[in-house]
Amino acid sequence: MAKKIVSAIDVGTTKIATIVANVRSQDDIEVLGVGVVPSHGLHKGIVVNMEEAKASITESVRDAQRISGMRIDSVNVGVTGRHITSLNNRGVVSIPRDDRLVRPQDLKRVLSAARSVSVPEGKRLLHAIPRYYTLNGEERVKKPVGMHGTRLDVETHIITASVSSVQNLVKCVHSIGVEVEDLILEPLAAGEAVLTQQERESGVIMADIGGGTTDIAVFRDGSIYHTAIIPVAGYQVTSDIAIGLGLPFNIAEKMKKGYGNVTPGLDTSKADEVGIENGHSASYRDLCDIVRSRMEELFELILLEMPTTDYQTLAPCGLVLTGGTANLTGLAELGKSVLRFQVRKGQPLGVGIYGITDILYDAAYATTTGLILWQARNKERSAWQVKRGGILGSFVSLFRRLFRA
């Protein structure tokens, strides 16, 4: 692909990050600038105060423009929240021509058939991602164009979102003079940043533990298989600390980041009492016990969101933890103990992307960098993602028309 400047906004509960990159190819991406500011006006992926959210997004975009030296006119925007739902659906069409040769228009027809699902009122399709194709009900294929058959099937992962929730987010971005070029489900982006191709092929669960939500994605056979959003994440850990130790919320957040450890017995360097500022202190063990308890609960919630209880068959590569809360000391070890299968911390792999190194390998910015990777690889028509446009393009176009009316 030709050199192109692309931008994206990761809109979270605790931070908003705008990233600008020079994309020369899917494996040659230079990050030019990132604007990171505290998030206000959002909760669990949903806009709850339009003016506050708009102000935070404005500040983040301005910082990214200043650092990169580039003007941001359009962006990809990450979408998450409890309103996200998903299912797998199959589409089937016949190949009517005498030569039985599968052509590009046949892929469009079968994908259209797969998208023909009943969507609840107030929701729209966000993504319709082909997982694999079959010809005549036989072997699975990734690229059937040019092959011969009488019947073409596609197994598709369908993701829907609340129209009002997405509309409010798009409106915030549009109101500062920036176009929304595309909407991307955040766990899809995070998966691009932290998962290896082997993990996606063999089967893996990814949990992006952010501030307000834990975004779940299961990958199998090289593509997305299951997605879910859990409204429990880092915010709830901080809230537990504040309530349990009688601390202001901002002090509890600093305590969590500075001393949070789910395996405190392994760290003999910490004093019995830890302090942060303004005379606030707490028992180190009490602090860590609170963090550990909430994380144990979260692991159980992750299992409840799985489509099967046969976890080893579903995900032989285990669980990959990413997001800011994944930086808690000892979290992967706790996960192994609770879940009884492989767990690792998922830092961005940094493959094919370079530039501002302080975020490129930080789990807290997996979604941020992943939004750029998703667009770069999507343009190259990677095996597990559908190209921008179609139903998703109409979703964005609908909002543009509404806001200009």
Describe the residue ranges of each PLM region:
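Nucleotide/phosphate-binding catalytic cleft detector across ATP-hydrolyzing
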Residues: 1-15, 19-206, 223-225, 234, ...
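Extended, folded domain segments that form the structural surfaces/walls around functional sites
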Residues: 10, 174, 208, 297, ...
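A short beta-alpha structural unit
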Residues: 193, 317-324
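A structural feature that tracks compact, well-ordered secondary-structure segments
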Residues: 215-217
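A cytosolic small-molecule/anion-sensing beta-strand core signal
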Residues: 220
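Nucleotide-binding motor/catalytic cores of P-loop/tubulin-like NTPases across gene-expression machines
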Residues: 226, 321, 325-373
